Design a protein with these regions (language model features):
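Structural signature of transmembrane alpha-helix termini at the membrane-water interface
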Residues: 18-21, 25, 52, 185-192
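Enrichment for repetitive, rod-forming helical segments
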Residues: 9-10, 55, 142, 190
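A transmembrane-helix-recognition feature enriched in membrane-embedded lipid enzymes
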Residues: 169-194
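Charged, low-complexity, helix-prone segments enriched in Lys/Glu/Asp/Gln
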Residues: 18-23, 45, 174-183
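Hydrophobic alpha-helical segments, especially transmembrane helices
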Residues: 3-4, 49, 184
């Protein structure tokens, strides 16, 4: 009985360690340094926009780039909604660039790289949700390397709904994380994963 109990405890601890490890693996963050732009990509636009705006107000970059279209062609692009939030928070419109046509993270990366090249920018801080940061970083790194001369640093959005240690204990965190893991697996396997 004692061996069973000890085995159960060790097994449960191992499973919890793996689940916590997954959260920490997805939530990639680099040391903050000043850049030419702060890029927030669509998805959970509230937390992402708020984090990008806070970084802009702290002087990390002179330009905000909001990237993301709308799933409904009749509605306003996510990037435009983030811009409105930033302007309402006191960011001057001339300190904001909008890319409102991308529908996937891969398109975010390509269109942001185009925008940065067109403006002569070379460095960015990439802001997205913590559970999305790893996959976004892979896609942005591929695109930025392909275009040459572009660099970015990861800075996950402050997201009170997602905890890297406890994501597996409740929804929607659990669902978001599992979907993200599936997309990351598809990306690593060489399939398109948004």
């Amino acid at each position: 009985m004692r061996r069973f109990f000890l085995g159960f405890i060790l097994g449960a601890a191992s499973i919890i360690a793996v689940l916590v490890g997954i959260g920490h693996f997805l939530d990639v963050a680099d040391p903050l340094t000043k850049a030419d732009a702060i890029v927030a990509i669509s998805g959970d636009t509230g937390a992402r926009a708020a984090t990008a705006i806070a970084l802009w107000k702290q002087g990390y970059a002179p330009l905000l780039i909001f990237s993301g279209g709308s799933q409904d062609p009749e509605s306003v692009a996510s990037a435009e909604l983030m811009k409105r939030t930033a302007v309402a928070a006191g960011v001057p419109p001339n300190a904001i660039a909008v890319e409102g046509s991308s529908a996937t993270t891969e398109e975010n990366a390509a269109r942001v790289a185009e925008l940065m090249n067109a403006r002569g920018l070379s460095t960015a801080i990439l802001v997205t949700s913590p559970y999305h940061q790893r996959r976004a970083a892979i896609l942005f790194e591929r695109e930025f390397e392909r275009r040459g001369g572009l660099e970015f640093h990861n800075h996950p959005a402050a997201d009170p709904e997602w905890d890297e240690n406890l994501w597996w204990t409740r929804d929607p965190s659990r669902t978001l994380t599992l979907i993200e893991l599936a997309k990351l697996g598809a990306l690593v396997a060489g399939q398109r994963a948004g």
